[in-house]
Amino acid sequence: AENMTHGMVQYVDMPNAKRLNLSYANGDNFVMRVDTSMKQPNGRPSVRLHSKKTYEDSVIVLQVAHVPTGCAVWPAFWTVTENRPLWPKGGEIDMLENANDQYPYNLAAVHVNTSCAVTNPEQTGTTVFDQCNAYANDSSGCRIAMNGTDAGATWGHKLNEKGGGTVAMQRDFSEG
């Protein structure tokens, strides 16, 4: 699979993911993981999922029971335009992301290829960057720190200790 993050990882196909036990069902949970059994000079084998179907107006919900934490991990759940080679044209929305445990909370973001800004947001988090242009702020886009009502429990060890959480997004292309 394509490595859009340019990280030290080898994304494997479905047969290899099954063979290496990197993705599987466990009761009501779907597990995705990285191979921790061997060191690889080009990065550890892991999985990356993408939808075969595209969505426009929609509600997307992710219930997560556990996120990996620590140095050299970059767990994320995001949406991107179906024209990925033209990124950031069409945009990207990061619903759940935090690389290398840099922050104690989840970081949501929007990346677009035009001038766009977050103004007067109705949110419980804190606006870290208000410019959504994908090339501004070291490619951070508009970034919101999810540190509002349940500070610290939106990411990492605190999220895992409370048994996980839910991230949801309504995508609506109508004006307003």
Label each PLM-derived region with a short phrase.
Residues 1-101, 105-109, 118:
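Low-complexity, Ser/Thr/Pro/Gly-rich disordered linker/stalk regions
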Residues 41-42, 152-153, 169:
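Mixed-charge, polar/low-complexity N-terminal
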Residues 46-48, 153-155, 164:
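Eukaryotic intrinsically disordered and solvent-exposed regulatory patches
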Residues 54, 69, 85, 150-151, ...:
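Short, glycine/acidic-rich beta->alpha junctions
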Residues 88-160:
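Glycine-aromatic-enriched beta-strand/loop faces of beta-sandwich-type recognition domains
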Residues 161-176:
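Localized edge beta-strand/strand-to-loop motifs within extracellular or lumenal beta-rich domains
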